[in-house]
């Protein structure tokens, strides 16, 4: 820190320096910035540093970084003004020991430094803190899934060159090099060698798909650092913040890489059920059917990034070396678990409309212990096959359009092939569909037998009056993937083929 920078930060600890009420000022320091918390506001000042992955060494670079941070993070704002965290980039006027905040545009030429001006939020509502208190809920992750799917659909797509694909392997190799130098306990070398071999092999297998995803627009200007500590609950919305502005290569990434980071972080926080729900909800919202193929590669990469950061921290002055190295080993162990998933299982639901299949399947996802389970909803996949969004109304009548006999057959065939692909990729699959006819259930049982994985049935029942009440209430609410009506229910009653004794042996207990 230079003398002028030291004087500036010291002076900005005085509440009177701010253009708003600030009873007291708190300082938070990161490797690249100081964040000054003053009343209902936060001011983020870049450190004048040059590191391998960021360069804030000149005033011009710090100004550009502040402006980029505001631009990039404003992309996560919603119609709720409380989510508008990034207010502007402001010039700081001198002298350094008596600073004041100027106006962008008018005072740019006389600035001695720059700051990002933010609306302060309640730190207790960061998702990592919610998780630590046991207050992080499936609906919070559902909000994030929808937020990211909408954001990614609107984000700028990368030009179709192979650079970002080869960058993925280069970054992964760099992580492993740092870890080999920093982790020296017995067994560390062997674990890292296994992860290196897995990384190289997986990349060679996935490279053609990664290139195709690039061509298909799946590489976009993303967040880049999407973990629980960079997400905050505001009202009933989860809002990302602190996206990467300082390194283009870390921001222009496959959309699955952003999602892999928070998915991995949920696993690290021992929340496999929430990880299942997040991924399933995001896949429903985004329709990104090939993301599960590449997500484990990116999740291992993200875990090793966190391990690398912990190793670097262990060597810094004043750091708790033992704790940092233990943290790095924990992330390395998590990377191994992701690279070596448990054997998958196949679960199907069975029940009439309104019997609670989606509710029961959500419970199963939350209870599943590996974090490697994906739900396929027939209501969503049926619409996807016909070019509609998950909650978009089709206008189809009974036995017509999306609900014609042929569309019904096509939907179950599609679900079967998707389940086959996911199971072969090491994902457990829960298929949320009515499965009223025996031959539909038998096709999935045969798939499980062919792949040699466990097969279960999640059966749900409710009295007819309750079914009718639930369907009527769901129609009144609207914005639901299901378009079942009371007329559809009457038709289903004619189709219903009860579970055989052999099928009941596969039923999971306490479904609904």
Language-model-derived ranges and their functions:
Residues 357:
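Conserved lysine of the Walker
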Residues 360, 364:
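Hydrophobic positions on the alpha1 helix immediately C-terminal to the Walker A/P-loop
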Residues 347-349:
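Hydrophobic anchor at the beta1->P-loop junction of P-loop NTPases
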Residues 54-60, 100-109, 116-228, 232-345:
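ATP-dependent phospho-/nucleotidyl transfer catalytic cores
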Residues 451-471:
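Conserved phosphate-donor/acceptor-positioning beta-strand/loop module used by diverse small-molecule
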């Amino acid at each position: 820190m230079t003398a002028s920078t030291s004087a500036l930060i010291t002076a900005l600890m005085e509440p009177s320096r701010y253009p708003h009420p600030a009873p007291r000022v708190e300082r938070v320091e990161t490797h690249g910035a100081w964040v000054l918390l003053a009343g209902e506001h936060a001011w983020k000042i870049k450190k004048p540093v040059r590191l391998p992955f960021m360069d804030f060494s000149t005033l011009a670079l710090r100004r550009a970084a502040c402006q980029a941070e505001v631009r990039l993070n404003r992309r996560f704002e919603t119609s709720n003004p409380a989510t508008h965290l990034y207010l502007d980039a402001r010039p700081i006027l001198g002298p350094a020991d008596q600073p004041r905040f100027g106006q962008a545009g008018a005072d740019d030429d006389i600035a001695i430094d720059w700051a990002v001006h933010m609306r302060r939020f309640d730190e207790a509502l960061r998702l990592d803190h919610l998780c630590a208190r046991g207050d992080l809920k499936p609906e919070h992750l559902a909000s994030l899934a929808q937020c990211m799917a909408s954001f990614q659909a609107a984000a700028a797509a990368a030009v179709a060159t192979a650079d970002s694909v080869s960058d993925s392997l280069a970054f992964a190799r760099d992580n492993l090099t740092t870890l080999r130098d920093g982790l020296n306990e017995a067994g560390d070398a062997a674990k890292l060698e296994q992860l290196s071999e897995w990384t190289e092999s997986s990349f060679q297998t996935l490279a053609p798909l990664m290139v195709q995803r690039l061509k298909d627009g799946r590489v976009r200007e993303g967040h880049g650092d999407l973990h629980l500590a960079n997400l905050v609950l505001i009202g009933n919305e989860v809002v990302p913040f602190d996206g990467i502005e300082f390194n283009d290569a870390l921001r222009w990434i496959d959309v699955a890489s952003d999602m892999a980071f928070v998915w991995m972080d949920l696993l690290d926080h021992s929340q496999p059920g929430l990880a299942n729900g997040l991924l399933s909800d995001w896949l429903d919202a985004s329709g990104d059917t090939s993301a599960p193929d590449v997500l484990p590669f990116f999740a291992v990469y993200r875990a090793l990034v966190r391990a690398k950061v912990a190793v670097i921290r262990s060597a810094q002055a004043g750091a708790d070396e033992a704790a940092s190295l233990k943290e790095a080993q924990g992330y390395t162990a998590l990377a191994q678990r992701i690279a070596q998933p448990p054997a998958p299982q196949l679960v199907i639901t069975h029940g009439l409309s309104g019997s609670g299949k989606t509710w029961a399947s959500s419970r199963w996802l939350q209870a599943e212990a590996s974090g490697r389970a994906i739900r396929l909803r027939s209501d969503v996949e049926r619409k996807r096959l016909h070019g509609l969004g998950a909650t978009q109304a089709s206008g189809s009548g009974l036995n017509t359009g999306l609900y014609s006999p042929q569309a019904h057959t096509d939907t179950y065939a599609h679900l079967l092939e998707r389940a086959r692909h996911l199971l072969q990729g090491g994902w457990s699959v829960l298929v949320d569909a009515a499965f009223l006819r025996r031959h539909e259930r038998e096709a999935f049982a045969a798939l499980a037998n062919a792949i040699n994985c466990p097969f279960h049935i999640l059966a749900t029942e409710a009295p007819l009056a309750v079914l009718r009440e639930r369907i009527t209430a769901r129609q009144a609410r609207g914005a639901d993937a299901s378009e079942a009506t009371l007329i559809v229910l009457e038709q289903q009653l004619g189709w219903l083929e009860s579970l055989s004794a052999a099928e009941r042996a596969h039923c999971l207990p306490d479904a609904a």
